[in-house]
């Protein structure tokens, strides 16, 4: 399993540009508990550079997961705190093989191989280096773990 910009909680869904007041995910056609969007928390996090408090009831339970996992995320993710999500997932994982990589230049959009995202307004070479590294890590991970099947 490869998780790119992972989250350790289920977030509220979005309709257009607005909160949906429903979970982003369902399981067996039932809405999962979710982290509600609160403008106050969002503004506080931006003004004081503090993480948004997590709703523990919205935590994604990975305790029974045993498959190999590769986590790829950014320490400067502008959408959610992927870095602390990686830490949380690693601390709760009970399986035998987990690998993670944290990048320091690119943000949330670490998704397109070999294409630096120009929305970050940083040196494209640094963005390209991280994009390439994440893609090669993904290929290596699949090569290592899918050959067994």
Stretches found by the model and what they are:
Residues 75, 103-110, 114-118:
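Histidine-bearing beta->alpha loop at or near hydrolase active sites
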Residues 78-88, 111:
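Conserved alpha/beta-hydrolase "acid-adjacent" motif
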